[in-house]
Amino acid sequence: MILIGEKINGAIPSVGNAIANRDEAWIIDLVQRQEAAGADYLDVCAGTTPELEYDTLCWLIDVVQSVANKPICIDSPDPHMLLRVFPKLTKPGLVNSISMEGENAMCFFRF
């Protein structure tokens, strides 16, 4: 079984507050607690507005990778954002999910 720690998500109020304040120490503590709990991957979701998502994801990825022993699972409702930030990963990662609505999956898969 592969366990994905999904606590680094800006939709969670306390995490959203830490992200908004760029509280690196708070995020690092969350990374360490999830790894200690047995997570195989660390899910990273900005949970911000589309205008802030790229910069927020880049910051989160940098912070998480600075201390994490585990790879990252990128989480965004925007498939183009996933493609944009995925190259920042220093270890092979995962994409959390891609909606099959409309043309969303076409940027990843050729049918």
Q: Which sequence ranges carry the predicted segments?
A:
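Glycine-rich, proline-tolerant flexible connector loops at the mouths of alpha/beta enzymes
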Residues: E35-K70
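Active-site mouth loops of central-metabolism enzymes
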Residues: L3-D29, L94-G102
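Glycine-enriched alpha-helix->loop->beta-strand junction motifs that scaffold or abut catalytic
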Residues: G38, P87-L94
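Surface-exposed amphipathic alpha-helices with a cationic face
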Residues: I61-Q65, F86-P87, F109-R110
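Glycoside hydrolase catalytic-domain context in secreted enzymes
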Residues: V31-R33, L42, M106-F111
